[in-house]
Amino acid sequence: MKFNRVWVFDLDNTLHNATPHIFPSINTAMNAYLQTHLGLDEAGAGDLRRHYWQRYGATLIGLMRNYATDPRHFLQATHDFPTLEKIVLREPGLRLTLRRLPGRKIVFSNA
């Protein structure tokens, strides 16, 4: 039996540096969501996000468990990037490196 190689890559902070643009946008949007939907001030939103990150590993999980937050609504409000191609920074040499890998390549992002 012949197996075809499949490479699966995470986009953010693996294939590109998400720190300068993507993550700050998500952080701002999540804080705004918590302020709007839970009536928190900015400090309270940040504190709750840190608490949920430490306890559940993600803000969304904490919101779902404690507030029955609809995950689709939360993600649409906090992870909307209409100009994504402008904020994903190219990594020099990455295209050539990926082309050298035999098989199918799949890129995903949990953001």
Positions of the model-derived regions?
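N-terminal helical cap/lid subdomain that shapes the substrate entry/recognition surface
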Residues: 2-9, 14-92, 100-103
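Substrate-recognition/cap helix-loop segment adjacent to the acidic, metal-dependent catalytic center
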Residues: 95-111
